[in-house]
Amino acid sequence: MNEFVNTLIARRSTKKYKPDMLPKDVLDQIIEAGTYAANGRGLQAPIIIAITNKEIRDNLSKLNASIMNAPIDPFYGAPVVLVVLADKKVPTCVYDGSLVLGNMMAAAHALGVGSCWIHRAKEEFELPEGKELLKSLGIEGDYEGIGHCILGYPAADPAPRAPRKENYVYYLD
């Protein structure tokens, strides 16, 4: 099988991480892969916020947990959180941001880094705390939180992949 296709098929969500920080060059490659995701009309609506600061990461984790009303770390101990947001003025913003997340997760797997998509970014950045984070970075505009790509080195083997469901694909010949 083609190496790239195998990378896509072999990727799994990682839900237990070592505390070790990723080297900057590895993180930068993952982020760069995200910036080259396909996007509607080439408008590049998404933005990526790379969080490696533990205090900020932990505060965002608490905010995310409060949205789902659960006393857990929704980021599973991952040391890096990449938040993807997208400009609401662009009609394809959610799709574009989703492709950014997918590219980053595939790149992470190719580099031996675990990843998982975590939801509730939309709700986070509708709250005052989320808006304040954007303001502190000088980010202006009307952005919607699309998702989080958490990253780190896996502390356990991923779960085996589930078989694909029947009737996943239909061909019209």
Can you say where each PLM-predicted feature lies in the sequence?
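Acidic, surface-exposed loops and disordered segments
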Residues: 1-173
